């Protein structure tokens, strides 16, 4: 079915230019590349752009460690990044750097427009200063204990444990991440972006469908906490763009980083005069702009970025799509275990098409983490791509070449073809909505049908019978046409395989050509298109990824849950005694509208009923909970939430998601009993 042409600009988050690409990064670029390739396959004008994020103190310090100028280091890293992406068949239309003239001009332009419109404030602040290095400490170069949840070893801008944002001066027991020294306070003048002025606009935008439900719900929490003015200044020494009219003051990297999307597109427009920058970025633009990002940078892309664009007279993105993290074999990527795998190490051992397919098979439109289980990876690739897909052609193509002059027959019974073509709109919708896993399941279900057809018809038996030659010709031609349709459906995911299949069919695979009559079409001799995953190659990749641990007397690293969630700092008995734990019976449980993770619980604690909102929806349905006994914190200060008042906390174990288990006391415990 023909569709009207859309004008689309799509981006992936900019990789930081201080190190190599790894398989965690690759999830996002594969996800975006599939979506971009799908749009182009449908005939839309789609531009996929990206750049290296090349500014900030980490760049400056890494270059110093290497004995290089920052400009030299980021140029080298940029070259390495582009080679890794190219070898993974990531088809950027332009790849640039935030350390570019286009980006400097745009960053200054946006800042000056924000200042002229009254959205830039200036004030003197006290900032942490490293007395040993004689430098102000940016937020990521201060570590300490989170002021909100008290988790140790957190950065100075946000907490990885609870997601809270704060200023470096709010950290408990801060230390310089550069020297380890205890920082001192020193006054300096900084410029702030007036984010609270955009609260109404942001609330409207975040509920316009621009964000996934999980993201929109998270933003509601931030709105409840109140938006704060955003410090966009860093003091010299700093590698970045100097702020206009402010010598010695530089733009914070997160101001010019998202502007890098615009800078890269401006660079593309300068190379291709037929493209108009304003057509995509002007306030009244009718083109579409989409950002694919990781869930760790939602705050910047869903609050600061649209507000900056709005305040400086540019358009906002249509949508910001977030994805989760990559784990390997069910655990956080580990250098010691060899599961922190660099893109180049993977490429040294395995076909990039394997990973593209595996990620696609597990991706959805949600922000769930994705586990790269290496045994499942090998099994799924071998089963789906080799055993089902390519095998369909390898079992039938030779008969066409040897017995029928390499030409396909006119298919008399089009029942199977019609059934395959009937799935195109469903598969298209799955691609459009980023439900790649559903698309892969649909396509592989069709592959099963096609293979069943070939197995039942057994053309290898038919060709031995003189009176069955035409039937054999029909069967093999039908199978190859189904193979052509399947690979066309998979073309956004498997571009290299699609090229091989195009050479085999001697024609370009197009979405509009799915229903093409292939009668009389001549094919080329079949060549092997994909090899099985040999697990010893997977093991070799893991071995090459391991970093040798120094032979020291350090204690053995914790195993199990302690490996990723270490025991917190020691407290004394008096601290623990302040916590009043009580047995509670869940008398009622229900869903909370517009809350992705919460259930509303009514808890009987022996003569008193408490209402508690618990983040356990991913693990329990309300009907599973009613009547159960559990343990609650009874003297926790009530917290007013958008959905109502939460009067305590239930206790659960586990890392989160579906892996959560509420605590259940033994039989005999009664509501209201104290837990000691």
UniProtKB/Swiss-Prot annotation:
Report domain tRNA-binding positions: 575-676
Provide one Gene Ontology cellular component.
cytosol
Q: What is its main location?
A: cytoplasm
What is the role of the protein in this entry? Answer: Is required not only for elongation of protein synthesis but also for the initiation of all mRNA translation through initiator tRNA(fMet) aminoacylation.
Q: Name one Pfam family in it.
A: tRNA_bind
Q: What cofactors are annotated for this protein?
A: Zn(2+)
One of the GO BP terms on file: methionyl-tRNA aminoacylation
Q: What is this protein called?
A: Methionine--tRNA ligase
Compartments, record wording: Cytoplasm
Q: Where is this motif: 'KMSKS' region?
A: 332-336
Regarding protein family, the annotation reads: Belongs to the class-I aminoacyl-tRNA synthetase family. MetG type 1 subfamily.
The entry's keywords: Aminoacyl-tRNA synthetase, ATP-binding, Cytoplasm, Ligase, Metal-binding, Nucleotide-binding, Protein biosynthesis, RNA-binding, tRNA-binding, Zinc
Short sequence motif named 'HIGH' region, residue ranges: 15-25
Example of a GO MF term: ATP binding
User: How does this chain assemble?
Assistant: Homodimer.
Top EC group: ligase
Residues making up the signal peptide according to the UniProt record: none
The note on the cofactor says: Binds 1 zinc ion per subunit.
